[in-house]
Amino acid sequence: TANNYLDPKKHATKFIAVRYGNVLGSSGSVVPKFIEQIKNKKKITITDKQMTRFSITMNEALDFILKSAEYGQGSEIFVPKIRAYTISDIKNSLTEILADYGEEEIGIRPGEKLHETLINSEEIRYSWEYQDVYMITNPLYPMFNPTIIDETYPGIKKLDKFEQYSSDLVDKIQKNELKKIIEESDLLKTK
């Protein structure tokens, strides 16, 4: 496992990870699916109107990966400070831009969650806020004691403002802003 590589004296390779939710418009995501349904003059299929998801654009995701590689010392998980959207706002944004052929609520599929969690309640104990990211540290890694963390990451703060980082608890991207993001992207171009 990765824990076998924790001792920097034995292994020079540093592993870090990123978590960032849904990349807006990526393959298999809801926006291209909804656009296709509208272009085919079909009802939009919605699992649950209250469903929320974190959202990041492709450029934001790429910038975040590079920033995480720059910040990382080894074994951290980096999570961006991002907002979320409701599935209803995505649907309403697209129907206002394109057309409205109705909707059909199909229910949540087995294993699907109503809200997305990027830092769970267990991980919060080992999580920090650093500049514009959250950082989950590995409690087994010797360099992640509070003194060394303070020295390595100037201005870092223990993350204690919520019990978990979940898409239902963060600020939402409003419909007008979603429309602007969608219109400025390449998502509406015919393939």
Residue positions per predicted region:
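Strand-loop microenvironment adjacent to phosphate/nucleotide-handling motifs in alpha/beta enzyme folds
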Residues: 3-191
